[in-house]
Regions:
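Intrinsically disordered, low-complexity terminal and linker regions enriched in polar/acidic
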Residues: 1-7
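Bacterial N-terminal signal peptides
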Residues: 9-18
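Hydrophobic small-molecule pocket/channel-lining residues, especially in calycin-type beta-barrels
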Residues: 3, 21-154
Length: 154
């Protein structure tokens, strides 16, 4: 193998590993810590979030309650590349995108009919034990909401 090919291969492996380890911070099962969270009036509440690798993609499954207290379950599969991917089971959005900013910081956006209904940031603590999601949006009745949800890794 030529030296140039070796260098290109090593750089490619390094970039792939960096992306995998960055995503690894988000992976796992996360339970809502209601005592540390600030759930705004009219906000949906995700009690459990499961983030797992599925092939080359990431699958995020959320279980919780809507603003009226009814159980919710939604699933999203895609990449942390900022592109929109379909979400199933979320009455407030039909697509969602996640963008990885660095190893522990992510941006999220949800759209319904092409219109942004929710956006925010997700931060994983340096020790990897806490995940904080700060989101703002508009619910199905047009009401505004803002939530800071703190999750503990299980």
């Amino acid at each position: 193998m030529k030296p140039k090919s070796v260098i290109v291969s090593l750089v490619t492996c390094f970039v792939a590993l960096t992306l995998c380890f960055g995503q690894a911070a988000m992976m796992g099962t996360w339970k809502l810590n209601e005592a540390k969270s600030k759930i705004g009036a009219g906000s949906p509440k995700n009690n459990t979030v499961v983030i797992e690798a599925v092939g080359e993609n990431v699958k995020i499954t959320m279980d919780g309650v809507d603003a009226a207290g009814k159980p919710t379950h939604n699933e999203w599969t895609g990449k942390f590349d900022g592109k929109e991917y379909p979400v199933a089971g979320d009455a407030n959005s039909d697509t969602r995108s996640y963008k990885q900013i660095d190893d522990r910081n992510f941006e999220v956006s949800g759209k319904k009919g092409g219109k942004v209904t929710v956006s925010g940031k997700v931060v994983v603590s340096a020790d990897g034990k806490t995940r904080t999601a700060h989101v703002k949006g508009t619910n199905l009745t047009g009401g505004k909401f803002e939530t800071t949800a703190v999750y503990n890794k299980q």
